[in-house]
Amino acid sequence: QSRSSAASDVYKRQILDDVVTKAGTSREAAGLEDDTVRTFVKHAAFLQLVRGRRLRLQRTEPNIGALATALADPVNPVTAQYHLAFVASDTFYEHTHRYPGQRHDWQADVDPLLSHAQTYCARIGLDLSDSDRVRLQHACYELTRGAHSDTPSTAAYLGGVAAQEVIKILTVQYIPLDNTCVYDGIVQAVSSFRL
């Protein structure tokens, strides 16, 4: 055994002793074996505690910084405007009891949807640049044109994303998405926001 390996083993044993001491139990009672400790120490740098937010807080107290950063991202395709359009779509539904675009004259719903989106942005204190306003208007147009429907390929893709998240949680091996994921099927862009 090399000198560094022996030092590493001493370090691992010390960590184990510290853990069981803090837990108020003995190593034998805890049933911790050297291999378990070795694996834990090896992967400890990748541990992450994920504390999600309640979905209700997305609307009432969203993370404005995350939205502003997502809208201003110079590298990745911007998808945050679709989140704002979806929030406005829910408000539209609350007022009209239908989703935008579900009537024959669907284009008449674009401006009211955009108005709901702009009202929401003003209420939460999100300042939109001119380019943000243009992207939001386009997102409201596309959402209205789609009339609250989806294509089979989009549904299949989102089903795959959901299945992947379930696998992450069940296997406890990967960090799951935290809070909001937006998929733009037109430009094939996916963004995740912690709102």
Task: Give names to the regions the model predicted.
Residues Q1, T36, S149-S153:
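Short, charged/polar micro-motifs that form catalytic or ligand-binding hotspots
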Residues Q1-A7, Y11:
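Single conserved hydrophobic/aromatic residue that forms the stacking wall/gate
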Residues S2-R3, T79, A147, L170:
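Intrinsic disorder and flexible coil segments
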Residues D9-Q137:
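Long, low-complexity, polar/charged, intrinsically disordered or flexibly structured peripheral segments
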Residues G101-D109, H116-V190:
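C-terminal, well-structured subdomains that either form a transmembrane helix-short loop-helix hairpin
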Residues S192-L195:
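Conserved catalytic-core surface of thiol
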